[in-house]
Amino acid sequence: MLDGVFNHCGYYFVPWQDVLEKGPQSEYFDWFMINEWPLDKRGKASKKKQLYTFGFFDWMPKLNTNNPAVRKFFIDICVGWVEKYKIDAIRLDVANEVSHRFCKELHTSIKEINPDIYILGEIWHNALPWLRGDEFDAVMNYPLGQSIKDFWIDKSLTNEDFEYTINRCYTSYMQQTNDVLFNLLDSHDTKRLRTDAKNLDEYFAQLAVLFSMPGSPCIYYGTEIAMEGGHDPDCRRCMPWGEIEAGKYKERIQKVSDLIHLRINEPLLKSRNFHFPNDYAQYPRVIQFQKVGWLDNVVEIIINCSEEDVDVPMKGEILFERHYIDSTLLPNGILMRRISEESKKESDK
């Protein structure tokens, strides 16, 4: 997947330099959103509304993707990436600030070459207008990631709150979109998961939820070792390769690998069908949901976010666990298991 930034450009982008040199006489003048000329040369042009930029930084002028010449320039580049380098996917940065016309023409141009190419948009809010089949295949699912993290950050939230926010995320879009949403818990633009999580147990619990949800789970580099980091740029620390090679994070990496392996090899974890049985409703901080397939098999996920032991009868096949001992799910415990409807009925008797 290549990252395409078509919302804005850098200061040394040749067309922008041509505009700075020639002003309105530049053939590229209309490539940008310039409201007034000449521009303030003290770095305050965008704050004076003389031109539109990304983040009010004068060195990142916004591109006018309503301009046919701009659209052709960047779409031709994308076509070249697909034809020459056979890329599998493209991510559009700040996608909600790129024109719909650009997104539609990009979709048509590269899907003609490779119908299976994955077009991903970086949009932080509800993105239904971009997900009607003629622009993006998916967006970065920040609402889901925030819903998961919020449950661990705000201890006053209950399993009913969790159920509501998860269901809200998955009723916002059509099923075929939910199947391919780009699910994440942290990125280069957010605090890292381990920094938000109070401890490693909370970190693993949130990953267990991530790998159980419909869509395409993604982990940010460093998340596999529980790397910490605050807001940008702290979230973009270098990987501690020396410590990794010395085995310092071996156990963490193995646990994350186990979850990834489980996601890949357990079809039910990829299922779009899930529900919340509420068998543990008396424990407001215990999450329980089940992934359901076509047959009678079910994968059940139970996570004890409370401060007390929870009795969870043994049944089925354990796929992944932390702090599950003798039918007791300890505080911060995780249980992922495969059960059948028959075994569930026997257990409920």
Predicted feature locations:
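Substrate-binding/active-site clefts of carbohydrate-active enzymes
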Residues: 1-80, 84, 106, 112
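Active-site groove signature of glycoside hydrolases
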Residues: 8, 73-100, 183, 187
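Active-site-proximal helices and loops of the catalytic beta/alpha 8
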Residues: 13-20, 79, 83, 93-176, ...
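Glycan-recognition and catalytic regions of carbohydrate-active enzymes
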Residues: 220, 228-229, 235-299, 306
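Beta-strand-rich binding/interaction modules
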Residues: 308-324
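C-terminal beta-strand-rich structural cap/linker in extracellular carbohydrate-active enzymes
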Residues: 325-349
